[in-house]
Design a protein with these regions (language model features):
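Active-site-adjacent mobile loop/cap segments within catalytic or ligand-binding domains
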Residues: 77-84, 93, 126-188
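Active-site-adjacent substrate-binding region
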Residues: 105-130
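Catalytic-core regions of hydrolytic enzymes
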Residues: 1-110
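Sec-exported extracytoplasmic/periplasmic mature domains
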Residues: 34-45, 68-72, 80, 115-124, ...
Length: 188
């Protein structure tokens, strides 16, 4: 394969992640990743490894280790945000001190490519790119890594809209990944 990605559905199993308005983050992230898988499965150019495809909880270390073991070109973690009930919007997290891909792609550049696709799919407020150097998966994954926060589960209307559009977000995950590989080929 010329392109290798690790796709991570945040939380899972005993770790529900954010819970609000009758929804659980772990279920939403899993459905998004499962939807993305249906697109990746039809693409012979990209090999995708998944940290989970069911309601299990891989540790944060296991998630990073998977990417490191398979020599991934990209690590893509999908999450749902939570804050006060009025918080709104889509943001994508990168690590300015994180590793680059083998071709020199930074966490910032990878995040900057995918963010508009996710934001466009949600239609939510654009919270932009946020530098987070302390997150385990963005710190220990030895390639270009990103973590996208689709929207706020703590916001009632946003949670409801997310729940009915998870498949669309999965498609955006796929399309944004394709765009990144077009823009920054792997050299494999």
């Amino acid at each position: 394969y010329k392109q290798i990605v690790v796709l991570d559905a945040g939380h899972g199993g005993s770790d529900s992640g954010a819970v609000a308005n009758g929804y659980k983050e772990k279920n939403m992230t899993l459905k998004i990743v499962q939807a993305a898988k249906s697109y990746f499965d039809d693409d012979p150019d990209i090999k995708v490894y998944y940290t989970r495809l069911s309601d299990t909880y891989p540790s944060l270390t296991e998630r990073s280790d998977l990417a490191n073991e398979v020599d991934a070109d990209r690590f893509y973690s999908v999450h749902i945000n939570s804050a006060g009930s009025s918080a709104t919007g889509t943001e994508t997290l990168y690590n300015s001190k994180g590793y680059k891909s083998s071709t020199g792609l930074t966490s910032y550049s990878w995040s900057a490519t995918i963010h508009p696709y996710i934001r466009s799919a949600t239609g939510f407020t654009n919270r932009g790119l946020v530098n987070r150097t302390g997150l385990a998966v963005l710190r220990h994954t030895k390639t270009s890594s990103t973590l996208t926060e689709i929207g706020f589960i703590s916001n009632k209307s946003e949670a409801k809209k997310m729940n009915s559009n998870l498949t669309n977000y999965g498609k955006a995950v796929y399309n944004s990944t394709k765009a990144s590989f077009s823009k920054n080929p792997t050299g494999r």
